[in-house]
Amino acid sequence: MSGFFITATDTEVGKTVVAGAIAGVFRELGYNVGVYKPLQSGHVASNPEGDAARLKSLSGVPTQENEICPYSIEEPLAPRLAMKRAGRVVKLKEITDYYNGLLKEFNSLFVEGAGGLAVPYTEDALVIDFAKELQLPLIVVARPTLGTVNHTVLTIAYAKAHGLTVAGVILSGCKECEMERVKENKEMIEELSGVPVLGLLPFFAGEFTKEEVLESAKEHIMISKLEEFIQNESNVAGAPSM
C-alpha cells in the first residue's frame, strides 16, 4: 500500500487543508494520487463547506465528493456517535474494503482520519484501528503554539505503541508574530519524539484559493522528504507513478 494517513492532535487543527494541499502538490508532480476521508460529521459530503469538498478542491482529483467520503452526517459529533444517532452502522471492514476499491483507480491514496487517533470512528473501531489496517505512514498535523508539544508527543507515542510509522509532523496555522515560539516548539517535538517536523504551514486568514495553498505547501513543507516515502513504498523505483 502506498500513500499517507493524515491524522492530528485534535480536531480543527488544519488536517484537511494539509491533506488536500500535499495531495495537490503530488498530483502536480505527476503522481497518480487520490484522497479518501471515509467518515465525515458536521457536513454531508456534497456540502461545499465540508472536508470532502475541500479535499477535492485542493487536491484536484476527479473523484466526486460522495466518493471521497462515502459516509457523511450533518451533526457535528464523533463519527461513531453521529452515525448511531442517525440510525446508521458503519463497520471497519466496510471502509477498508472501500479503500482497496479506490486503489484500483490510484497508485497512492492520502487518507484523512477524523480528529485524533483515539476518536471513536466506526461502530467497531477507533481511528487508530483503521490506520493499523492500512499500515500507511502517518503525517501528524498539530497546532503550532501553546500545548502542542504535549499533544504531539503523546500522539506520536500512541501511534508508535501500536506499531505505526510516523513520517513526520506538520505544524499548521503558523503566524509570523509567533514564529519564535513555533520554532522552539518544533525543536522540542523533534527532540522528545524522534520524529521530524516537516513543515510550518502559515495561517490562512479568511478565504483562500487552491493556488495560494499549494504554493504555500511547496514553500513551507518538505515535499521531497514525503516523496521519499512514496517512492520507497511503491514498486516503481525512483520515479513517480503516472
From Swiss-Prot:
GO molecular function: ATP binding; dethiobiotin synthase activity; magnesium ion binding
GO BP term, example: biotin biosynthetic process
Catalytic activity reported: (7R,8S)-7,8-diammoniononanoate + CO2 + ATP = (4R,5S)-dethiobiotin + ADP + phosphate + 3 H(+)
Subcellular location: Cytoplasm
Pathway per the UniProt entry: Cofactor biosynthesis; biotin biosynthesis; biotin from 7,8-diaminononanoate: step 1/2
InterPro entries reported for this sequence: DTB_synth_BioD, P-loop_NTPase
Cofactors (names): Mg(2+)
CDD domains hit by this protein: DTBS (cd03109)
Positions of substrate binding: 41
Residue numbers binding Mg(2+): 16, 51, 112
Positions with a binding annotation for ATP: 12-17, 51, 112-115
Ranges annotated as spanning the membrane: none
Function text: Catalyzes a mechanistically unusual reaction, the ATP-dependent insertion of CO2 between the N7 and N8 nitrogen atoms of 7,8-diaminopelargonic acid (DAPA, also called 7,8-diammoniononanoate) to form a ureido ring.
Family: Belongs to the dethiobiotin synthetase family.
Subunit structure: Homodimer.
Listed name of the protein: ATP-dependent dethiobiotin synthetase BioD
Encoding gene (name): bioD
